[in-house]
Amino acid sequence: MAKAKFERSKPHVNIGTIGHVDHGKTTLTAAITTVLAQKGGASATKYDEIDKAPEEKERGITINTSHVEYETANRHYAHVDCPGHADYVKNMITGAAQMDGAILVVSAADGPMPQTREHILLASRVGVQYIVVFLNKADQVDDPELIELVEMEVRELLNEYGFPGDDTPIVVGSALEVLENQDNAEKTKCIDELMEAIDSYIPTPERATDQPFLMPVEDVFTITGRGTVATGRVERGVLHTGDEVELIGMKEEITKTVCTGIEMFRKILDEAMAGDNIGALLRGIQRDEIQRGQVLAKPGSITPHKKFVGQVYVLKKEEGGRHTPFFNGYRPQFYFRTTDVTGSINLPEGVEMVMPGDHIDMAVELITPVAMHENLRFAIREGGRTVGSGVVTTISE
């Protein structure tokens, strides 16, 4: 059967399955594609196809992830599923697969388990704001009161990590039963309910072009008689000729200037938007006032900081990371957007050292300020090689 062409007219949302090992994340992913395929909104993907996830390299870190896509009447979804727990940790911290929302899969037969808790914590740390719960394996539970009990436990757990547990949609069903009874509407109903909950509860993310303008400066050069040009890829928002912008980072003070011209592929543009690689001509800026590592941004939209707390995954030796642990006061480089800045690390109380393969919260103080916001990703490097990957969880000052 010919594959239906995906219409890009629908809003796009990135989601993924999270939860404890063997609670049925991959089976559920297969069940969703199977049910939606019958409505023409997906191509059915079998369990084994999802389970043998290809290895991906993201910033040098090996992550196994499966990507499937499907659509409901209202939206187009890209869905990630990871086979192993370690893959989830890496995925969420590196932002390899950005999630706008998550489906937390909990086995109704077992209730919340250690990784259930850990994935909820990770989701809250890396800025996944919306979780919909699927209580799986309901066919293995005869007593409805047990299911209610598990539901209460899950809601309490979500509340504990700052999610609105009492308002979170919880759908009860059995993904395996769905796969075994594809033509039985009664058995597949739980998938319809789940997709309805996701459609209505997880909001459509703000498009990059609707956010305030920001462009990391990659290179700087002077055009005789015209002035200084900063080049880079617009990360978010839109820039128009004549817009006021701020130059932020690498020094304490913020420089205000005006963009007097935009070039792309040697053509003059009136505006540039998220994703464009451009050169921006800046009024009254000297060549030595601007450098790689700074950002051009809409005035007031982002500020420079030196101190922050980050959630970090430390690469294993096999991933090209360190062979030995590091201790308090370790001073690597922190790579933000386009540049390395040296910083020193403070480990949490009671933590003596960090081993390759660990993930940990750490307080960092940089030697020069960087334009940053919460959920910004960074890499930790030593002599040009990546030894860790992290996300800013809180800005300290």
From Swiss-Prot:
Residues 81-84 are annotated as: G3. Residues 19-26 are annotated as: G1. It comes from the Bacteria. Signal peptide: none annotated. Residues 10-206 form the tr-type G domain. Residues 60-64 are annotated as: G2. Mg(2+) binds at T26. Residues 174-176 are annotated as: G5. GO terms for cellular component: cytoplasm. Pfam families: GTP_EFTU (PF00009), GTP_EFTU_D2 (PF03144), GTP_EFTU_D3 (PF03143). Its EC number is 3.6.5.3. The keyword GTP-binding applies. Residues 136-139 are annotated as: G4. GTP binds at residues 19-26, 81-85, 136-139. Belongs to the TRAFAC class translation factor GTPase superfamily. Classic translation factor GTPase family. EF-Tu/EF-1A subfamily. Monomer. GTP hydrolase that promotes the GTP-dependent binding of aminoacyl-tRNA to the A-site of ribosomes during protein biosynthesis. This is Elongation factor Tu. It comes from Clostridium botulinum (strain Loch Maree / Type A3). The lineage of its organism: Bacteria, Bacillati, Bacillota, Clostridia, Eubacteriales. The gene is tuf1.
